[in-house]
């Protein structure tokens, strides 16, 4: 996963359910690019 960005992965329903079009990081299994209040 070295040098891989979040945008390299497809969005996950889990991230979408947050209320924003967040990217899902396949490497860490977390959402990234989150700009929603209360979510970091």
UniProtKB/Swiss-Prot annotation:
The alphabetical list of record keywords is: Calcium channel impairing toxin, Cleavage on pair of basic residues, Disulfide bond, Ion channel impairing toxin, Neurotoxin, Secreted, Toxin, Voltage-gated calcium channel impairing toxin
Q: In which tissues is it expressed?
A: Expressed by the venom duct.
Post-translational note: Contains 4 disulfide bonds.
Is Disulfide bond tagged as a keyword?
yes
Q: What is its main location?
A: secreted
Q: Which GO terms describe its molecular function?
A: calcium channel regulator activity; toxin activity
Record localization: Secreted
A GO CC term assigned to this protein in UniProt? extracellular region
Give the signal peptide, or none: none
| Protein function | Omega-conotoxins act at presynaptic membranes, they bind and block voltage-gated calcium channels (Cav). This toxin inhibits rat Cav2.2/CACNA1B calcium channels in a dose-dependent manner (EC(50)=2.8 uM), whose effect is partially reversed after washing. In vivo, when injected into mice, it shows both an analgesic effect in acute thermal pain at 30 and 45 minutes post-injection and an anti-nociceptive effect in a formalin chronic pain test.
Any other comment in the entry?
The framework of this peptide is described as framework XXIV but this framework name was already attributed to another cysteine pattern (see AC J7JU64). The framework is therefore renamed to the lowest available number, XXVI, and the peptide is consequently renamed RsXXVIA.
**Domain comment in the entry:** The cysteine framework is XXVI (C-C-C-C-CC-CC).
Name the record gives this protein: Omega-conotoxin RsXXVIA
Task: List the source organism.
Answer: Conus regularis (Regular cone)
Q: What is the lineage of its organism?
A: Eukaryota, Metazoa, Spiralia, Lophotrochozoa, Mollusca
